[in-house]
Swiss-Prot record:
One of its GO terms (cellular component) is cytosol. Its EC number is 2.1.1.170. Belongs to the methyltransferase superfamily. RNA methyltransferase RsmG family. This is Ribosomal RNA small subunit methyltransferase G. Its main location: cytoplasm. Specifically methylates the N7 position of guanine in position 527 of 16S rRNA. It comes from Pseudomonas paraeruginosa (strain DSM 24068 / PA7). S-adenosyl-L-methionine binds at residues 81, 86, 132-133, 147. InterPro entries: rRNA_ssu_MeTfrase_G, SAM-dependent_MTases_sf. Keywords: Cytoplasm, Methyltransferase, rRNA processing, S-adenosyl-L-methionine, Transferase. It catalyses: guanosine(527) in 16S rRNA + S-adenosyl-L-methionine = N(7)-methylguanosine(527) in 16S rRNA + S-adenosyl-L-homocysteine.
Length: 214
């Protein structure tokens, strides 16, 4: 993990403490190993516009961890438009008892995610290269999460077939999406909203939890 320094480890530990997320030594090691892979592969694969490793800790790792206190929707999860693996990879590390499926239509990104699965030995992680509309899992997911993926309307419409009455949809947003909420499909409702304070991140962060009404 040559690109990852003690400073990054300390920043991760402090931020997790602020978020109230418990990290044992193994989970810290895995998160930092993931960060090292993200730094290495980003040079060729353009996984994220964030280039500074210091920013990656706050804007990717800690941002992903910020939803952990609200991610209580069962053991079978889908990360839609996972990209470089946020928040799916950190969630898979934090919850080894849960099954995490990472879905993305970009082949370069799914190749990277497959490498992460192999190198970090994440047996609970599945990587799927597909468009969300074409993805047909065997059973509904308990939780469906997206981070900077689409509008709430598109998120609901494109993933409706992937969940059921008990599913929670978690949409990670920046500023509060008032206009997007006005366009939310009639068969979805907002179950909860949370303003998130992510250590080291400027600007607003919000998490919206959606449920089906029919």
């Amino acid at each position: 993990m040559s690109a990852v320094t003690r400073h990054h480890a300390d920043e991760l530990a402090r931020g997790a403490d602020e978020l109230g997320v418990a990290l044992d030594a193994e989970k810290k090691h895995q998160l930092l190993a993931y960060l090292a892979l993200l730094i290495k592969w980003n040079k060729a694969y353009n996984l994220t516009a964030v280039r500074d490793p210091d920013e990656m800790v706050s804007r990717h790792l800690l941002d992903s961890l910020s939803i952990v206190p609200h991610a209580e929707a069962g053991d079978n999860w889908l990360d839609v438009g996972s990209g470089g693996g946020m928040p799916g990879v950190p969630l898979a590390i934090l919850f080894p008892e849960r099954r995490l499926t990472l879905l993305d239509s970009n082949g370069k990104k799914t190749r990277f995610l497959t490498q992460v699965k192999l190198e970090l030995k994440l047996a609970n992680l599945d990587v799927v290269h597909s468009r969300v509309e074409a993805f047909r899992p065997e059973s509904p997911f308990d939780g469906i999460v997206s981070r900077a993926f689409s509008s709430l309307e598109d998120f609901a419409n494109w993933t409706r077939h992937l969940g059921g009455q008990e599913t929670r949809w978690l949409a990670m947003k920046g500023v509060h999406p008032n206009e997007e909420l006005a366009a939310l499909p009639e068969d979805f409702r907002v179950e909860a909203e949370h303003a998130l304070a992510v250590p080291g991140c400027q600007g607003q962060r919000h998490l919206l939890i959606l449920r089906r009404t029919a």
